[in-house]
Amino acid sequence: MTQTLGAWGRSYEIIVIDDGSTDDSFAILARLQASDPRLRVIRFRKNFGQTAAFAAGFAHARGRLIATSDGDLQNDPRDIPMMVAKAEEGYDIVCGWRKSRQDAWLSRLLPSKIANAIISRATGVRLHDYGCSLKIFRAEVVKSLRLYGEMHRFLPAIASEMGVTIAEMVVNHRARQHGTSKYGISRTIRVILDLLTVKFLLSYSTRPLQIFGLIGLAMGAAGALVTGYLAYVRLIGEQSIANRPALLFGILLLFSEIGRAHV
């Protein structure tokens, strides 16, 4: 990283997030930081996940353009200069596309292709590789976003609501030499749940009253069903409904819809 950026001739800083590592990573990073003022290390006391790491990096970054990359050495830093050049053409986000991805087909590539197709369809922002961490962002774009869960992978889709311009570029991807991936089925489930959240936000963030309108209609329909049933019980079945909690519940649901209609 330092060799590539140093030869590039541009000013830069490197922010490394130690996401609760259990080996000697932090000790090594601390020694490197002592000898290079451009390196900044942020340490989490426990593992908070990639989204929290991204959020911390965005918050502490001081440059106008921010590059993100995984720590598994599969992303190639030599792609950063060309991606920055693309951003300087006027794009707010430049996304990497690992077209020749060096991962197992069944366990990584196939699920990734399916996930990218689903995310692109659900969000309306079509990218080949949402999971590629190698991206360039304009600082003002990501610093205004609030991230949680597994939402780092949806950044382009979330930011699209701000009217940003997005480009995608083919980048190099190297085979993993050290460690093993922590991605598994539980991670996939969390991603799906967060995708539902993102879809909800993208659908109603600019028209929040519509969701309340839908909720109000549902409540009104439920109230009509409840009171209609109770009316049937009283008139046809000739049973008393005065002491039934459902009567009060149905009336409240109906009045909530009537009140919404007159606001």
Describe each region flagged by the PLM.
Residues 150, 154-262:
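Hydrophobic helical membrane-anchoring modules
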Residues 31, 38-60, 65, 77-161, ...:
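Acceptor/aglycone-binding surface of glycosyltransferases and processive sugar-polymer synthases
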Residues 4, 8, 17, 86, ...:
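Histidine kinase transmitter module recognition
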Residues 18-27, 73:
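A conserved acidic beta->alpha catalytic loop
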Residues 2-5, 29-33, 87:
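Conserved hydrophobic residues forming the short capping helix/wall of the S-adenosyl-L-methionine
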Residues 2, 8-21, 42-43:
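Short beta-strand/loop segment that forms part of the nucleotide-sugar
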Residues 13-14, 61, 128-129, 206, ...:
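Short hydrophobic "helix-edge" motifs at membrane interfaces and signal-peptide entry regions
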